[in-house]
């Protein structure tokens, strides 16, 4: 089955050569997502909860554009800039995954913009 590109309405232009998501064989792959506005400026610079909420809402939009829901998410890769934000990020994360949680990993690292606090990449399997 061929790959389909997923670009939700209102998406910002990526900073590099990639798209927000792709769909292949019922699997949605969501690119690393940060809390950016439509001009790739970081939103909520000092607020890990607001950034996480924005990131996950953006991911949800990509998955819904592909025909899925957040319940279809099977794996998240989470990148954070400071462990002090871990609890705040998890608090918002739990709101988006209230039932069975997807598998995931979380690492501390630098991100593409200095004010970015969290980046998440996602895989979801859409039921046929």
Curated annotation (Swiss-Prot):
GO BP terms, alphabetized: nitrogen utilization; uracil catabolic process
Top enzyme class: hydrolase
Keywords associated with the record: Hydrolase
EC number: 3.5.-.-
Annotated GO CC locations: cytosol
Classification via Gene3D superfamilies: RutC-like
GO terms for MF: deaminase activity
Catalyzed reactions per annotation: (Z)-3-aminoacrylate + H2O + H(+) = 3-oxopropanoate + NH4(+)
PANTHER family in the cross-refs: 2-IMINOBUTANOATE/2-IMINOPROPANOATE DEAMINASE RIDA, PROTEIN HMF1-RELATED
Subunit structure: Homotrimer.
Family: Belongs to the RutC family.
Protein task: Involved in pyrimidine catabolism. Catalyzes the deamination of 3-aminoacrylate to malonic semialdehyde, a reaction that can also occur spontaneously. RutC may facilitate the reaction and modulate the metabolic fitness, rather than catalyzing essential functions.
UniProt xrefs under HAMAP family: RutC
Protein name: 3-aminoacrylate deaminase RutC
Species of the source: Escherichia coli (strain SE11)
């Amino acid at each position: 089955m061929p790959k389909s590109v997923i670009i939700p309405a209102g998406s910002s232009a990526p900073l590099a050569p990639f798209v927000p998501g792709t769909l292949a064989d019922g699997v949605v792959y969501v690119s690393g997502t940060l809390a950016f506005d439509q001009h790739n400026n970081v939103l909520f610079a000092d607020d890990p909860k607001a950034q996480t909420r924005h990131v996950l809402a953006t991911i949800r939009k990509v998955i819904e554009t592909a025909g899925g829901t957040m319940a279809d998410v099977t794996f998240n890769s989470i990148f954070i800039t400071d462990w002090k934000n871990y609890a705040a990020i998890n608090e918002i994360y739990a709101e988006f995954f209230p039932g069975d949680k997807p598998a995931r990993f979380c690492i501390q690292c630098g991100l593409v913009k200095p004010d970015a606090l969290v980046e998440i990449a996602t895989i979801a399997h859409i039921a046929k």
